[in-house]
Amino acid sequence: MDAKVREPFSFSPSGEKVATGRMRGRPPGHQTPTVLVSRRRCDIPPRRYDTQHMRELVIGIDSGTQSTKALVVDAKNGRVLGEGAKAYGLIDGLPAGAKEQHPADWIDATESSIRAALRQAKATAAEVRAIGVSGQQHGFVPLDKKGQVIRPAKLWCDTSTADECDAIMAKLGGLKGAVKELGNAVLPGFTAGKILWLKKHEPKNFKRLATVLLPHDYLNYWLTGNAVMEYGDASGTALLNVRTRKWSKKTLKAIDAGLEAKLPKLISSDQSAGTLQASTAKRLGLSTGVVVSAGGGDNMMGAIGTGNTSPGVVTASFGTSGTIYACAGKPVVDPKGEIAAFCDSTNRWLPLLCTMNVTVATELIRRDFKWTHSQYESAARKAPVGSDGLMLLPYLEGERTPNVPDGTGVYFGVRAKTFTEKHFARATMEGVTMGMNYGLRRLKKLGIKPTQIRATGGGSQSKLWRQIMADVFNAQVVTLKVGEGAAYGAALQALWSLRNNQGDRVGIEEITNRFVRLNKRETTEPNAENVSIYQDVQDLQSKLSTSLRSSFQLHRKLINEDNCF
């Protein structure tokens, strides 16, 4: 049965009027989304300014899986002047492996976050000059010809499309053929499989499909009325040849003969998506002249926000998912398809590993033991390095690196000695970090040699966890003055786009070198003894992952098809 979207949009409470219009840059018949325009302007406190000394502000938005954050940044010095955030969740009651959200929730959270950040910054509308958007990668937002959302978005963490990915890979000639055609394997979680899934499982909805967007593209569409996609986020669709930065016609044909007509215009990272359209500007209390940058996926924006804009820098993001990536001057293609050969959002490339289960695992432990974050860390400190042999395979809802789409979480080594809160607390931190190190080992084999890793995300705020990172990765770990790497990166890209629009042809690295600052007080060095212990544990974890794959498949069949649980 075709899924139905809850509603096309739900931007605000009742008492509002509707504004519609044709999507600029699209053929007749394509419409901008139905935008509910509030009668109330955003409550930004009035300020009097000498226009010669008016501040120049940019906004960075990070629309993630669990929440949306907004930062107001001073374009002169890079300082964060205001912050806002709003949380939301996944749709409940879906089959195992399916992960979906209502795009309307992103819009609502974006508006709320921007308003809060503007209030904190005491900003006037005239001061805000540009907006940049970071969004969770790979999600599939299907629009009809009127620009309305057809169904909920399937997300990056959705592993229900494994069969569709296998079918596309087969038409491309298997792994070898896919890597040759795209530079990447077609993995569950990537967008390509989701489109074929819609065609196969919801044919009526597929027939309505007019435009394919990613989450950050959809927010840009709401902001500007333009449907565009920049190269960095597009490279995560498994539809783009990362070497040529062009759509792969062979891959598109493997999904549907008419798919290319449904894809938006590709733009480079230094181009703008447009300017704020009137209806959205009115909702936010901002000017229609505000520049909206190309934006990008959260990893691409995280690279900018951590200063990872020139070869030699490596970033590790410890959020809901985990990613490690490096800036490269040319494509770094993995013949095994385990490392993603993405484009970045600076017109370079971003070899990247992604694990799907990081803070999602530690937060489950914290919740179940009813701990605060400090209580969690205190408990984990009481267990020794290696947790006395208790190990976690953190594949709670499948995994991408290594590619275990049917995986589930496994605690291995449970004994009377290790059946304690402290052991489970530390083993979970160690397990998700070693899950990321599986991919880092592969990156090293492809020529990426990190001596310093810039850590960002919620996990990087823990002193103990930073030490575990340094010991598992065997590299120095540093943090950033601004911890919200993706939102800050979106703000800096917005500034880059603004300067380009003003005729100042500056490089993004000039901006990041000026504004991105390391928190040197939190520099963490690896402990040689701990490094040795973790290398042995890592080897066993990798071996377990391989040996359990057939069992994972049987287990997924048990819980999905046999309806036993």
List where the protein language model places each region.
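Short beta-strand-loop/turn "lid" adjacent to the catalytic site in phosphate-handling enzymes
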Residues: 119-157, 184-189, 220-241, 265-270
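Active-site core segments that coordinate phosphate-bearing ligands/cofactors
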Residues: 59-61, 162, 169-185, 189-190, ...
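Aromatic (phenylalanine/tyrosine) cluster motif
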Residues: 9-11, 49
